[in-house]
């Protein structure tokens, strides 16, 4: 079992450098998605580690967007994170903003799911329910093909992420929708409490 800072300490570190509700909501979503994946893929004993990497993956993005994944090691070290967590967090920016390659399965999931949660979240907001609970893969695939929809979500990163995991794009979408369903209520409750 990997050692990890407490969730309270991780959340405090996130909020020290992130104030926009959108960024906090995204971090909480990726945290929940990563916890789901850890349990789903047989890494349940390391679920806290996976979730913490998800929570802190964009710790530097709001204040230092031009140094994304480059400023993070300093901030994470200050928060008490170890080298494994720092590597995991930075690896989600591989090929885009840094050269830290995702090697461990958790890092590959973070690389793929981070970008996909943005696309799924945007698609959910367009639904009458405003929820991922009734979203189907077929409707997400249509949004994925529409390059103008959620244009900031890189389809190349999502596709490359699926390939790195050895999954089809459809498998990645299906799993990530299920992961987002698992945490939607808790994320909404946390955001309402802010």
Predicted regions and their residues:
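Acidic/His-rich, divalent-metal-binding segments that scaffold phosphate/diphosphate chemistry
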Residues: 1-64
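Conserved active-site and cofactor/substrate-binding residues in soluble primary-metabolism enzymes
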Residues: 5, 9, 25-29, 67, ...
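Short polybasic/polar patches that bind polyanions
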Residues: 15, 39, 77, 145, ...
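A generic structural signal for well-ordered alpha-helical segments enriched in polar/charged residues
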Residues: 32-39, 74, 78, 182, ...
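Divalent metal-dependent catalytic cores for phosphoryl transfer on phosphate-bearing substrates
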Residues: 43-150, 159
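A structured, mid-to-C-terminal "fold-capping" secondary-structure block
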Residues: 138-194
